[in-house]
A protein has these predicted regions:
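C-terminal peripheral helix-coil segments that are non-catalytic and often amphipathic
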Residues: 1-19, 108, 112-115, 151, ...
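Basic, helix-initiating cap at the start of DNA-binding domains
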Residues: 1-46, 50-59, 76
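Alpha-helical structural segments
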Residues: 30-41, 45, 58-59, 76-96, ...
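Short hydrophobic/aromatic patch on the recognition helix
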Residues: 61-71
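Short, Lys/Arg-enriched C-terminal cap helix and immediately downstream tail that follows
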Residues: 79-80, 187, 215
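Amphipathic alpha-helical packing segments from all-alpha helical-bundle domains
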Residues: 90, 136-163, 173-177, 181, ...
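Amphipathic alpha-helical segments used for helix-helix packing
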Residues: 116-137, 188
Length: 215
């Protein structure tokens, strides 16, 4: 009944007309994608504090004023790149089968994050003193996706605990922050530099140590 009342009182909605982007709009979007790819790589290697707008513009191959047509500040640029990262993480989370054990879902998402790190696509986490932290907090799209991400991972952690896969004495926050930290762990690079392991082997070793320890 309530749904019927809402439907009856709502004005008829005309189907939206999908406007095809113009050539200029496609160019603008392609340039923006290139900018964010460069930013993602710089954040993965140097971090936010050492990144400069001059460096981004030079690597993309555009003038600095052109860069500011897309992003009016370094903070907005980094916040947009981090938001895209969370979008990719949420795609991985949503790809996990509902009937899959929670611990397996956590492992699968960690594998994705570790692989992204080894491929140079995982930005370094901002430190507690980094100036990007406030910019991220003020960027609504980032906060919205971060809440979705932490809610999903938090539910898996609680379910895995109920299933006896995670120690009851370990707080949920510690488990979650540990998973986040593993995605940016320099151990990945150290293992790769030995030349003894493939990327796939490194990922599995890290997952094993994270969830099973050294025993």
């Amino acid at each position: 009944p309530i749904r019927s009342l809402i439907k009856a009182s709502s004005p008829a909605v005309k189907p939206a007309v999908v406007k095809r982007p113009s050539f200029r709009e496609k160019q603008f979007q392609a340039r923006e994608d290139a900018i964010l790819s460069v930013v993602n790589r710089i954040l993965s290697t140097k971090g936010y504090d050492l990144m400069t707008m001059d460096e981004v513009a030079a690597e993309v191959g555009i003038a600095k004023p052109s860069l500011y047509k897309h992003f009016d500040s370094k903070e907005m640029l980094a916040a947009t790149a981090m938001t895209r990262l969370l979008d990719r993480a949420l795609l991985q989370i949503n790809a996990q089968a509902v009937e899959q054990p929670a611990l397996d879902s956590l492992k699968a998402v960690l594998r994705w994050a570790l692989t992204a790190h080894l491929e140079g696509n995982m930005p370094l986490l901002p430190s507690t003193r980094s100036t990007i932290r406030q910019a991220l907090i003020n960027h609504a799209p980032y906060v919205e996706r971060l809440i979705q991400l932490t809610d999903a991972i938090g539910q898996w952690i609680q379910q895995a605990r109920k299933e006896g896969q995670i120690c009851k004495s370990v707080p949920d926050e510690l488990v979650m922050f540990t998973l986040f930290a593993r995605a940016c762990d320099p151990t990945l690079q150290f293992l790769r530099e030995t030349g003894q392991y493939t990327n796939a082997q490194i990922v599995e070793l890290m997952v094993q140590v994270c969830f099973e320890g050294f025993t």
